[in-house]
Every structure is written in structure tokens, then in C-alpha cells.
Amino acid sequence: MSGSPHDFAADAFHAGQLYRSCFRELTENCGFTPNEMFVLLFLYRNAPEQDTAPAIAQAWNVSKPLVTRSVDGLQKRGLLYCVRDENDRRLIHLHLSDEGHAAAKALHHRCETFALTLQQGISEQEMQTLCSVMQKMQRNLNDLLERT
């Protein structure tokens, strides 16, 4: 990468394609759609503090109906169940079933292995720099989207 905006954009696009291809293979091999996988992983990592469809939608910056479709599919397969909040009947808390917890744990392990593979040959300092730069770029992209 020479550092020009065009080269950067091309490299970022190519890296994104490679990442999506690897990630698609990961999700296809486990039998979940990417959105279902994200719901399972989100609940595995964040419940019970954040265990509602609106919390998931906000964390991903996606619509609640998109999350609801994934929740419905996982619920039909017995991987999660819903419990209405005792204090606020409008809120529905999502809970992983034992089978859902086992599936989420296996997915979490696969994602951790995938992340470690991506990080091979990259020093801790380089990772910190990369994360810092990516956070700045995400803010820039969010600002750009808000202006349009």
C-alpha cells in the first residue's frame, strides 16, 4: 500500500472481501445465518446486562425487525427463549437455552480462533495502533452517514 487514498480504498475493499469470505465460511459451517450468529454471540457475551432485541439492534446499529427475525429463528430451534420483564411488561429479555449456550460457546471459540489467526505476526503495539485507527475511521464513517 503506497498510502494514496485510492490505494487505501482498494486495499480496504479487498481486505473486506477476504474477511467476509472467511466469515461466510465460518457461519455456513455452523448452520447459522450471520445475524443469528451475532445474536447468539451478543447474548453470550453481554447477558444479562444487555439481553433485549433493542439493545442488540442499538449495539449493531441495525433495525429491530432484523434482530427480531433472527431471534424468531433461534427461538423456533430451541436455542433461546423470551421472558417478559416483571417491572416493564413492554420489555422482553432474551435468554439462551442450554443448547443455545453450548452453541454460542462453540461459536465464541471459533471466532476467537479466527481472530487469533488474523492477528498472527502482528505485535501488540501494532494491534493497538490498528484498533485506534479503526475506531477513528468508524467515527468518520458515522459522521459521513449522519450528514447524508
Predicted segments, located by residue:
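Charged, amphipathic alpha-helical coiled-coil/dimerization segments
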Residues: D72-S132
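N-terminal leader segment of winged-helix/HTH proteins
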Residues: M1-C30, R77
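N-terminal helix-turn-helix DNA-binding core of bacterial DNA-binding proteins
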Residues: S21-S63
